Amino acid sequence: MKDLPAAMRPREKLLALGPAALADAELLALLLRTGLKGTGVLQLAGQLLAQFGGIGGLLQADPAGLKTVKGLGPAKRSELQAVLELARRAIVSQLAQRPVFDSPQAVRDYLRLQLGRLDHEVFAVLFLDAQHRLIAYEPLFRGTLTQTSVYPREVLKRALALNAAALILAHNHPSGVAEPSRADEFLTQSLKTALALIDVRVLDHFVVGRESVVSFAERGLL
């Protein structure tokens, strides 16, 4: 970056104009600090973003995925993972501090972070209080690439134990396609009926794919 004019260097640009003025690659370059022989740090940052599909994809990157990036040694990987984890925790904090339906995009982002990168199917529940604030996020069931077994009685037990007033269901499709199946619809209705017996509302069911998150409520499937 020394070859760049001072005003174009990410650090100087940030100090002069603020972080919002920097592109994603420039912000990432500040974290990486150095590039490789023949590859500048800005170019390395751009390659990293391209490999993972932008900042959103990078947030979902796991340690094994980061290990495949040439030029990311243990020190850089650990620093990058720390920043990514802080970003994930910020989203969790945002959900915990206010009613989740004040920010449906935050729910989507959170679920994508939790479930979008998994290669196995997981069924999870967000347990909410009467003001629809997050009490707990719990992955309750884990399955194969094609199916997972969900037991309504276990969901009811956790809802009662946590004194939840409402909940949001979520599961991922490791195939990458976030399209609800007939089995997903049947399960949702079964859980909704069972939970109504203990006066707990099902507010939504999200299906998480690699690139998108589908809401049952928005589809009219609740």
From Swiss-Prot:
Keyword field: Hydrolase, Metal-binding, Metalloprotease, Protease, Zinc
Motif (JAMM motif): 171-184
Name under which the protein is recorded: UPF0758 protein Lcho_0695
Taxonomic lineage: Bacteria, Pseudomonadati, Pseudomonadota, Betaproteobacteria, Burkholderiales
Family of the protein in this entry: Belongs to the UPF0758 family.
Domain of life of the organism encoding this protein: Bacteria
Entry binding sites for Zn(2+): 171, 173, 184
Pfam families: RadC, UPF0758_N
Annotated ranges, domain MPN: 100-222
